[in-house]
Regions:
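Active-site-proximal beta-strand elements of phosphoester/diester hydrolases
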Residues: 2-14, 115-125, 153-157, 209-215, ...
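Active-site neighborhood of phospho(di)ester-bond hydrolases with catalytic His/Asp-centered motifs
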Residues: 6-8, 49-55, 79-85, 122, ...
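Active-site environment of divalent metal-dependent phosphoester hydrolases
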Residues: 13-16, 58-63, 85-93, 126-129, ...
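Short glycine-enriched, charge-decorated loop/helix-capping segments at active-site entrances
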Residues: 17-23, 97, 127, 165-172, ...
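His/acidic metal-ligating clusters that form di-metal
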Residues: 31-49, 130-210, 234, 241-242, ...
Length: 266
């Protein structure tokens, strides 16, 4: 059984700054503290790594990326970083040169685990809020898929499907059809798809492939099926996902690590 974590939509600003009334860096510190305590090597649920599925910063500021790097160094396990629409590839690479990129400079990479192949994709379109995969990125994905014949776990920032929230659905991956054409021959190997961007806990299936997203680390998107001309923000609790992937199951837990609700023995 492989245990790993997902964190998303940090929206860090320069240290000392606030965003929509919140301090994103302080929330990251609390998340790192909680992940290290609950999922460190001596815990009951040690994690192999955390995948951070994009929007690492809000404005792509160098100081924000440097603050991110400093906090992630406190984790007792590796962090795999991805970019979202609020990010800057150049800014991220300048602050954290070790971030893997492909031969064309896209922030995406693949690695193998006991549970299968993990493929982390770059759906960023500079200056635009929606996601997309150009022909170069789709070709890269196709190559990564044929390198292995085992289970595959996919990670991207933008969802490739509509989820019924008008404010979010217009910002999905524009090339979803072409994306699926690359994935379709490998349908039986696709165990799960993880993404961020929505700032909401959503799960379901797309072309039969299970997917899930979680709330962001910073602000959230309120559940409003009628919001068509604005983004209904909220201060709902931040969360991260705890994923347990085995040979015959994938279980995704959402942990509201900032929820002050009292806990007790039943």
């Amino acid at each position: 059984m492989l245990t790993f974590l997902q964190l998303t939509d940090l929206h860090l600003v320069a240290p000392g700054g606030r965003l929509y009334g919140l301090d994103p860096l302080e929330r990251l510190r609390l998340a790192v503290d909680d992940m290290a305590r609950r999922h460190g090597p001596d815990s009951a649920s040690p994690a192999a790594f955390v995948v951070v599925t994009g929007d690492l910063t809000h404005n792509g500021e160098p100081d924000a990326y440097r603050a991110l790097a400093a906090e992630l160094r406190r984790l007792p396990f590796p962090a795999h970083l991805m970019v979202g629409n609020h990010d800057s590839r150049a800014g991220l690479r300048a602050a954290i040169p070790s971030v893997p990129v492909d031969a064309r400079g896209f922030v995406q990479h693949a690695f193998d685990t006991p549970a299968g192949r993990f493929i982390l994709l770059d759906s960023l379109v500079p200056g635009a809020p929606h996601g997309d995969f150009c022909a170069t990125r789709l070709e890269w994905l196709a190559d990564r898929l044929v390198e292995s014949d085992g289970p595959v776990f996919l990670f991207l920032h933008h969802p490739p499907m509509e989820v019924g929230l008008p404010s979010s659905d217009r910002l999905m991956v524009r090339s979803a059809g072409e994306f699926w054409e690359v994935l379709a021959p490998h349908r039986e190997r696709l165990r799960h798809m993880f993404f961020g961007h929505l700032h909401r806990p959503v799960c379901g299936s797309w072309h039969g492939v299970p997917f899930s997203s979680i709330r962001g680390l910073a602000h959230q998107l309120w559940l409003d099926f009628g919001a068509t001309d604005h983004y209904p923000g909220s201060h709902e609790p931040a969360a991260y996902a705890v994923v347990r992937a085995g040979l015959d199951s994938v279980v995704v837990h959402t942990h509201d690590f900032m929820d002050p609700t009292a806990t007790f023995n039943l």
